[in-house]
């Protein structure tokens, strides 16, 4: 229950934290990215106002975490349709920003892309709407793609294969194995 607050970290009351959650949850992917870049003006319980940066431009002040096998279960979360287990999730300051789906060598990379499309449609809810980047790998190929908004009618459009790119280094040399 701590967020960075211009220069220092402060604990928020349950009511203050709830206001922050309401501000960040259930937006489109684009709106979520904008919220992460902007300052949030929070009125504290005592009437004072603070400006919250969700990410610091000084990257050393952010907290980076990696989770393994996070499970979303409809028995525990009402807006999740199917039970899913995500391979690797990268969080910055507690917000999920990147999702990595790993497959065994020999498994087609498109299976990982299709799996993420299912996750996007049925289980990436709440704070998982903040996912901005997906990485898929089978140790033979490694590719990445950005998350995108649902269509105007609220339906999800699958990630287009033409918008999935090979992972490369700064000289545009393909990187296939993740270490």
Could you describe each region identified by the protein language model?
Residues 1-179:
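An alpha-helical interface "stripe"
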């Amino acid at each position: 229950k701590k967020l960075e607050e211009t220069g220092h970290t402060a604990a928020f009351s349950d009511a203050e934290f709830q206001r922050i959650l309401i501000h960040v949850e259930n937006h489109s992917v684009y709106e979520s990215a904008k919220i992460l870049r902007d300052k949030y003006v929070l009125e504290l319980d005592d009437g004072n106002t603070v400006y919250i940066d969700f990410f610091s431009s000084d990257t050393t002040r952010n907290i980076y975490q990696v989770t393994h096998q996070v499970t979303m279960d409809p028995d525990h979360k009402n807006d999740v349709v199917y039970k899913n287990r995500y391979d690797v999730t990268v969080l910055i300051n507690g917000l999920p920003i990147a999702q990595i789906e790993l497959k065994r060598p020999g498994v087609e990379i498109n299976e990982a892309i299709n799996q993420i499309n299912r996750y996007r449609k049925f289980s990436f809810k709440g704070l998982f709407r903040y996912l901005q980047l997906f990485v898929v790998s089978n140790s033979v190929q490694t590719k990445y793609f950005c998350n995108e908004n649902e269509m105007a009618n609220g339906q999800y459009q699958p990630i287009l294969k033409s918008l999935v790119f090979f992972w490369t280094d700064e000289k545009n040399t393909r990187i296939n194995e993740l270490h």
